[in-house]
């Protein structure tokens, strides 16, 4: 589940 959250955060930047 962390992978999805991490991906979203990185996508924002």
From Swiss-Prot:
Compartment annotation: Secreted
Source species, domain of life: Eukaryota
Keywords, sorted A to Z: Amidation, Neuropeptide, Secreted
One example of a Gene Ontology biological process annotation: neuropeptide signaling pathway
Modified residues (Phenylalanine amide): 13
A GO-annotated cellular component: extracellular region
Descriptive protein name: Lymna-DF-amide 5
Organism: Lymnaea stagnalis (Great pond snail)
Lineage, opening ranks: Eukaryota, Metazoa, Spiralia, Lophotrochozoa, Mollusca
């Amino acid at each position: 589940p962390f992978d999805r959250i991490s991906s979203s955060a990185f996508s924002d930047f």
